């Protein structure tokens, strides 16, 4: 039973988001005092709130999930978990995560994570995902909140750098999500989800993805230009952004779009891990680098 309740929190999504939380935290910690305990508390708090959002998403997406091969065996679709119990579970996760951030980290982090939760649950899950081709864009707003909360956990104020970080992860979400939609396009068609590749076609989605990847690279380098990140960050971010751009700009059609979109997706993960990793490493004094 414990395994079933764990599965509806979508641990993979939580882990991916916590990497971006750490990225924001590490970036802020370059100029503000921080501690490992603060990082751990922030990760736990944000993780609980994300888990709650994923549970609610599972509850409301039962009708969609049963139409998709990838999701038709989820616990709530199969009736293995009571819906009312899942709602209570989501509420407990949300209250504990928010309270932890509010009391131990700072109130601003708690407020921002709640705003992200509202966007994900009420705007994205309940409406835009089902009814609009712009659902991915709305979802990108909530998806960019975790790194922002990581940053605010250290600074407790919104700065130009924090705003740039938020915009950067909004931009990252778009080609990342479109890539997923492309290699799972039949599932999205079966469920009637109006994502851009399904509604407007592969060529249109490809154009959008190229634009977002380029914009992401510009903003990523912008963090260095503001003096918030070091030369190690510049080298790594430039390298991963170049690789992501190179893959994204490859020719794509109906014969190779599945393989191509999987490559774009994998590169998007490498980009986040590379940027997050180098921001963490820059906090460590390395005499042979500095």
Curated annotation (Swiss-Prot):
Entry's Gene Ontology cellular component terms: plasma membrane
Alphabetized GO MF terms: protoheme IX farnesyltransferase activity
Location, primary (coarse class): membrane
NCBIfam families documented for this protein: cyoE_ctaB (TIGR01473), PRK04375.1-1 (NF003348)
Family: Belongs to the UbiA prenyltransferase family. Protoheme IX farnesyltransferase subfamily.
PANTHER family on file: PROTOHEME IX FARNESYLTRANSFERASE, MITOCHONDRIAL
Protein name: Protoheme IX farnesyltransferase 1
């Amino acid at each position: 039973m414990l395994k079933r309740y764990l599965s509806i929190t979508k641990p993979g999504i939580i882990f991916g988001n916590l990497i971006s939380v750490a990225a924001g935290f590490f970036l802020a910690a370059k100029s503000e005092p921080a501690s490992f305990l603060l990082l751990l508390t922030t990760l736990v708090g944000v993780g609980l709130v994300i888990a709650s959002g994923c549970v609610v998403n599972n509850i409301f997406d039962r009708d969609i999930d049963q139409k998709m091969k990838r999701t038709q065996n989820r616990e709530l679709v199969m009736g293995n978990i009571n819906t009312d119990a899942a709602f209570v579970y989501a509420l407990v996760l949300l209250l504990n995560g928010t309270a932890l951030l509010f009391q131990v980290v700072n109130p601003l982090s708690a407020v921002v994570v709640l705003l992200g939760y509202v966007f994900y649950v009420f705007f994205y899950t309940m409406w835009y995902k089902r009814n609009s081709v712009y659902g991915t864009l709305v979802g990108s707003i909530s998806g960019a909140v975790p790194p922002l909360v990581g940053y605010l956990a250290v600074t407790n104020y919104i700065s130009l750098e924090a705003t740039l970080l938020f915009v950067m992860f909004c931009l990252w979400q778009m080609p990342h999500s479109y890539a997923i939609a492309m290699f799972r396009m039949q599932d999205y068609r079966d469920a009637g989800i109006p994502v851009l590749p399904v509604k407007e076609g592969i060529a249109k989605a490809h154009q959008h993805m190229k634009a977002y990847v380029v914009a992401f690279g510009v903003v990523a380098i912008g963090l260095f230009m503001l003096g918030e990140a070091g030369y190690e960050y510049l080298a790594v971010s430039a390298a991963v952004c170049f690789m992501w751009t190179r893959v994204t700009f490859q020719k794509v059609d109906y014969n190779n779009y599945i393989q191509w979109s999987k490559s774009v997706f994998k590169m998007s993960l490498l980009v986040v891990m590379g940027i997050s990793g180098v921001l963490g490493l820059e906090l460590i004094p390395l005499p042979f680098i500095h």
